[in-house]
Curated annotation (Swiss-Prot):
Native source organism of the sequence: Saccharophagus degradans (strain 2-40 / ATCC 43961 / DSM 17024)
Name this polypeptide is given: Large ribosomal subunit protein bL19
Keywords: Ribonucleoprotein, Ribosomal protein
Positions in coiled-coil regions: none
GO molecular function terms noted in the UniProt entry: structural constituent of ribosome
GO annotation terms (biological process): translation
Top-level taxon in the UniProt lineage: Bacteria
PANTHER family: LARGE RIBOSOMAL SUBUNIT PROTEIN BL19M (PTHR15680:SF9), RIBOSOMAL PROTEIN L19 (PTHR15680)
Gene Ontology cellular-component annotations: cytosolic large ribosomal subunit
Top-level taxonomy: Bacteria, Pseudomonadati, Pseudomonadota, Gammaproteobacteria, Cellvibrionales
Disulfide topology: none
Family: Belongs to the bacterial ribosomal protein bL19 family.
Function: This protein is located at the 30S-50S ribosomal subunit interface and may play a role in the structure and function of the aminoacyl-tRNA binding site.
């Protein structure tokens, strides 16, 4: 039995995005984020490796990590947020774990992820 009220479930189902591509930890993705600067809005791309996914319906989120000027940057995005314009998968990674937090300690060639073939 579900712990959420039926009305709440229906409201959440309306807000779910339908155009979210299938991606998993280890994949390299480009996330287009809406950024508001003053009175104008633009898209900003954030490209990196998905190190974690959290699947909770409307509260689903994923964490993307990239190295910018030698410094590791991680951003967590809400999958169904209006701020996230699009998610594009650039390359599929071949990993065995669901959470890739160990990449935080690795640098350079050690932090590379094998590409999934086939």
């Amino acid at each position: 039995m579900s712990s959420k009220n039926k009305i709440i479930q229906e409201l959440e189902a309306e807000q779910l995005k339908q155009d979210v591509p299938e991606f998993s930890p280890g994949d390299t993705v480009v996330v287009q984020v809406k950024v508001k600067e003053g009175n104008r809005e633009r898209l900003q791309a954030f490209e990196g490796v998905v190190i974690a996914r959290r699947n909770r319906g409307l509260d689903s989120a994923f964490t993307v990590r990239k190295i910018s000027h030698g410094i590791g940057v991680e951003r967590t995005f809400q999958t169904h947020s209006k701020q996230v314009d699009s998610v594009a998968v650039k390359r599929r990674g071949d990993v065995r774990q669901a959470k890739l937090y160990y990449l935080r300690e690795l640098t350079g060639r050690a932090a590379r992820i094998k590409e999934k073939l086939g």
